[in-house]
Each structure stands twice: as C-alpha cells, then as structure tokens.
Design a protein with these regions (language model features):
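Short functional hotspots at interaction and active-site rims
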Residues: 1-174
Length: 174
C-alpha cells in the first residue's frame, strides 16, 4: 500500500489538472443536523434533532478543476448496477478524449463494464491506491456539501434532493 501511494504521488505532477475527473459517492439523509451550536453564556442551547425513522440516499458526482460535474442522487445504496447506470447516463456524456477518471476501489467501481464505458469516450480510468481517500479531493467537497445540508436540515427526500442541487450549483473554482 505504501508503494502504491508513493507511485501515485510521483505521477501526480505529470498530470494535466484540466483533464482530471475525480468520482466518489457519499450518503445523505433526512436526519442531518449541525453537530454544534451557539447560545449566550449561561443559557442552554435548545435545538430540534430528529429521532425515529429517516431516509438515506446516495449522492455521486465528479469533480473537475472548474467544479462539480454529473451529479446523481439515488434512493438506494450504491452497487455495481447503479454505478454503471450513473456512468452511462450521467458521466460518460460529459467526458472528453484524454481525460482521466479517478476513483477509489469500491467494489461497485470494479464491476464489468465500468472500464469499457469510460474508455469508450476516449478517457482513461485510474484507481486510487487502496485506503487512500485523502488523495481524492472530492472528499473535501463532500464535507462542504454535508455541512450545507446539516445547516439546511431538510426532513423530506424531495427537499433534501432540491437542497443538494442548490448546493452543487454553488461549487465553483473560487
């Protein structure tokens, strides 16, 4: 693993950042709340936190130098079939020859047809070294996305999906 990480870091300076597309997925749910709050000294902070049943969805997207690309929300956990559908319908139409699609080693990313779908567009597929989420910059974008979702506190799936769309449109290079 150490050798794979060293090889990855050695190759990075040779890559054209405008050709990189980082892909990952994250879970979102209707029970997301801020982990901390503020109130006047000596006063008790009172906030509503959902209990009971909530819905979880999966958000998958790509990150380019100029922002998020090909966002996709699905009301199910990620599996190979869903990921392949995402590639064919959302990501592949946005890819150009020479681009490098980079993703982690999730089993859903290794199903038959993934590499072929990406390479059919003229792009290449690179897998990150195992256990290396720190090498995928989309992780920081997802942390920011989740912070916005916690702040919004949406409690229904349609409202959550609308909020995801609003936040994703705000991801720009600045």
């Amino acid at each position: 693993m150490r050798v794979a990480r060293a090889n990855w870091k050695r190759e990075q300076p040779r890559l054209d950042p405008t050709k990189l597309v980082f892909i990952d997925e994250t879970g979102t749910s209707t029970n997301m709340t801020r982990p901390r709050g503020r109130c006047r000294r000596g006063k008790r902070l009172v906030a509503k936190v959902p209990h009971g049943h909530w819905k979880t969805t999966t958000f998958v997207a790509g990150l380019r130098q100029d922002g998020m690309t090909a966002p996709f929300v699905v009301d199910a956990p990620m599996d190979g079939e869903i990921f392949l559908t995402y590639l064919e319908r959302c990501l592949a139409p946005t890819l150009s020859p020479g681009e490098i699609v980079t993703m982690d080693n999730l089993p859903a990313h290794k199903v038959a047809g993934v590499r072929e779908t990406i390479e059919a567009t003229g792009a290449r597929l690179w897998l990150l070294p195992p256990y290396s989420p720190d090498l995928n910059p989309i992780e920081q974008s997802f942390a920011k996305l989740k912070a916005h979702l916690r702040k919004a506190g949406e409690r229904s799936i349609p409202a959550l999906w609308d909020q995801i769309g609003t936040v994703v449109r705000g991801f720009t290079p600045e």
